[in-house]
Amino acid sequence: MIGKQTKGTSFGGCVRYVLKEEKSKLLEAAGVEGTPEQIAEQFELQALLNDKVKNIVGHTSLNFSPEDSARLKSDDVLMLNIAHDYMKLMGIENTQYIIARHIDREHPHCHIVFNRVDNDGKTISDKNDFRKNEKVCKMLTAKYRLHFANGKDHIKEERLRPYDKAKYEIYKALKDELPKAHSWDDLKDALADRDIDMKFKAVSYTHLTLPTNSR
C-alpha cells in the first residue's frame, strides 16, 4: 500500500473528481452530506473558521497492489478500516471528511478528502507529512498483511509524455541491470545495449541520458 498526498485551496474540483458517479462509491462521510456541490460548499464554510490556512484541502489516495485486488474487491469494510487507521495515525481527526473508493483501475484504491480546518477552527498540521505518510503506510501494510504497491511497476506507458517515458525506460533498465552488474563498466555496457548513455558528472553520482534518436 502506498499513500499519495496532495493539498489544495478549493474543494470543488477535488470533491467532484472523487465522487464521480461512474467510477466512485462513497464509503463514509463525516460532517458533510448531499450532492458533490453541497459537500464542497460545506467544506468551504467550515474552512472560514480559520482564514490563516491557505491550503484547506487535504487529499490522500491509498493505493493497493493488484495482488490485493481479490481480497479488497468486495470488502468495503476492510478498506474503510484501513482508511480509518491511516487517518488516526496521520492525526486527521475531529474534522469533516469523505472516504470513497474508485473502481476504474486494476489496482484497488480509495480517496480521503478532509478539511485541514478542524471542527474547532484549528489547523490540522502537515508537518513532516511525507515521512509520516511513508511510515504509516508501511505499518498498515504489515498490520493488514498487504503487498507493497510499487507505483512505477504499474505505470501505463502509453499514457506517458515523451520526457516521462524516457525517464521510465531508464528506471526499468536500471532495475533490470543493476543486480547483474559487477562494476560501473558492466552497467555502462548493459545500458548501452539498450541505447542508454551513462556519463559520470561527479565522483559521487552519475547522470543518465537517452540519445535523441531513442524510441
Predicted regions and their residues:
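N-terminal nicking endonuclease/strand-transfer module with a His-rich metal-binding environment
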Residues: 1-208, 214-215
